[in-house]
């Protein structure tokens, strides 16, 4: 997916892909601010099959979203940042750029 990019561009692209193709659609689908690892894995597998992407690429993106503060992990659940809840309630598009902007505005 990202072989010809530098390390930082590759990490950003992994985060962007995981957020826009897996996490945000999952959040809208389940209509909840949190999801389990099992729910994530099911959605990831569906997306990876359709897009032809390795699951290992998406795991790096998930960890990176945790490090950026867009996602939080508590016990067995992953949750979105509180500033993104309004987007979920409105069923609005929340791309990676919007998500990172909202998270940075809070801190």
Model-derived features: where do they sit?
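Short amphipathic alpha-helical interaction segments
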Residues: 51-67
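Short alpha-helical segments that sit at the start of domains
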Residues: 1-34
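Short acidic, glycine/proline-enriched loop segments that cap or flank alpha-helices
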Residues: 49-53, 87-89
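Minor-groove-contacting beta-hairpin "wing" of winged helix-turn-helix DNA-binding domains
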Residues: 76-83
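Short acidic, hydrophobic short linear motifs in intrinsically disordered regions
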Residues: 32-46
